[in-house]
Design a protein with these regions (language model features):
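Glycine-rich, aromatic-lined ligand/substrate-binding cores of catalytic
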Residues: 221-256
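Conserved small-residue
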Residues: 105-108, 122-222, 260-263, 269-295
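Extracellular/periplasmic, surface-exposed regions of secreted and cell-surface proteins
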Residues: 1-168, 310, 314-393
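Glycine-rich, charged/polar anion/phosphate-binding loops
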Residues: 45-47, 214-218, 225-230
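Extracytoplasmic gating/loop element in the C-terminal half of outer-membrane beta-barrel translocons
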Residues: 248-349
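Short, surface-exposed charged micro-motifs
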Residues: 64, 191, 231
Length: 393
């Protein structure tokens, strides 16, 4: 059993900071006014003289164990990280202060916790060159913002406090408007024109209008909370087979961009083939001749000419599960050791057939789930086959 506790500080500013010397008050010229035919002077940056390092309290409890003559090995760690003094630009300073720019301060706080572990089991099958090994690893990491510098929010769910860092936020979709009567009996939506077959949203605050005040935290973020893998290796004399799986869970992403706009002129591709299937989209009965095609639960909204501000809002309609399980690697090898090789100065030769990214299981069928959040704008994951020969002299 292991345990550790420590306090550390971060020796640099966060990567997104655009201010190099935030503790300095800077003076610059301004062209908005003059005195005696000369340019005026103004503060271009208000310095923050009381900045300090971001601090973190880190705690860890771990267990290392071996059983059955060390055939079974296990390591498990439970960790917690409490960060304070996170460097942020102030947002709650009133305009009456008359500041030309908002100062920076150590005001953010966040708590992270989770566990990490792996297990392995080795089963001898006779001699030392005959065995079976099974391994698995699992990591789960969660966090919650406990203090965040932000302007005053009208509703609690609009605040970052109490939620996961980077949680995907958007409107809650209630399917598609079935017909004009459905529109007439629903709260007004302030995202441009909309017709039957367009996305219908939930009025979260109950004020009779769906607008940006109804954007809420949805589910998870682009960063998976859970990562796991498992592998096995079988060796019988000169023959060896190994298989590796990897996966992630509790991760979501928004479908969007030109990838999901049929007939788009972009070069990144689109879903025109998927849209072409009438069962996947809302179609007016005036076009299809069948009332059943006005499906409020269709995969896609109606086809429209030009853009649709209403349908392009970030919402649960476009939020997808990014979880997947991938067959990452399979390797089959055979080792040659004989007198014939020694005539050529070789100790051994290993011939291997290797396959990478052979299969993936996921709810996402159109793109590789590990890249689905990029909506088709990145080079895809490749399936690779390799024939390999290793010579040892």
């Amino acid at each position: 059993i292991r345990a550790s506790y420590g306090r550390v500080v971060k020796d640099g500013l966060t990567f997104y900071d655009s201010v190099r010397f935030p503790y300095l008050t800077l003076i610059g010229y301004t062209g908005s006014g003059s005195w005696n035919n000369g340019s005026g002077l103004t503060e271009t940056q208000v310095g923050s003289s009381n900045l300090r390092w971001e601090k973190a309290k880190k705690a860890d409890i771990g267990i290392d164990a071996r059983f059955f003559h060390e055939r079974f090995e296990m390591t498990v760690d439970f960790f917690q990280d409490i960060r304070s003094g996170i460097y942020q630009q102030r947002q709650s300073v009133p305009e009456e202060m008359g500041l030309p720019s908002l100062p920076w301060a150590n005001v953010g706080e966040m708590k992270s916790w989770g566990m990490d572990g792996h297990i392995s089991y080795t089963q001898p099958l006779g001699d030392n060159d005959k065995y079976l090994i099974v391994r698995a690893n699992y990591t789960q990491s969660m966090n919650k913002i406990t203090n965040f510098e932000e302007d005053l929010k009208k509703y609690d769910y609009q605040s970052a406090v109490g939620y996961q860092s980077g949680v995907n936020r958007g409107l809650i979709a209630l399917g598609l408007f079935k017909d004009q009567a459905d529109i007439d009996n629903s709260p007004r939506q302030d995202f441009g024109n909309y017709l039957p077959g367009d996305i219908k949203y939930k009025d979260v605050n109950g004020d009779g209008i769906v607008n940006w005040d109804d954007i809420v935290p949805l589910k998870y973020s682009y960063v998976p909370q859970i990562q796991y893998g498992f592998a096995t290796e079988f060796n019988w004399k000169n023959f060896n087979v190994s298989v590796l799986f990897e996966g992630v869970s509790r991760v979501t992403y928004f479908k969007g961009g030109n990838m999901y706009q049929p007939f788009s002129g972009s070069t990144v591709g689109n879903v025109i083939t998927d849209f072409a299937n009438p069962a996947n989209r809302w179609i007016s009965r005036e076009i299809s001749g069948d009332p059943a095609t006005e499906n409020p639960n269709a995969k896609y909204p109606r086809l429209y000419y030009g853009g649709s501000s209403n349908n392009s809002q970030s919402s649960s309609f476009w939020l997808s599960d990014g979880s997947y399980l991938r067959l990452k690697n399979v390797q089959v090898s055979y080792t040659l050791k004989n007198q014939f090789l020694k005539k050529f100065g070789l100790q051994k030769a290993v011939i291997s057939m290797i396959g990478d990214n052979l299969a993936v299981w996921s709810k996402e069928k159109m793109l590789d789930p590990a890249q689905a959040g990029d909506n088709g704008t990145v080079y895809p994951v490749q399936r690779v086959y390799t024939l390999q020969l290793n010579l040892s002299f």
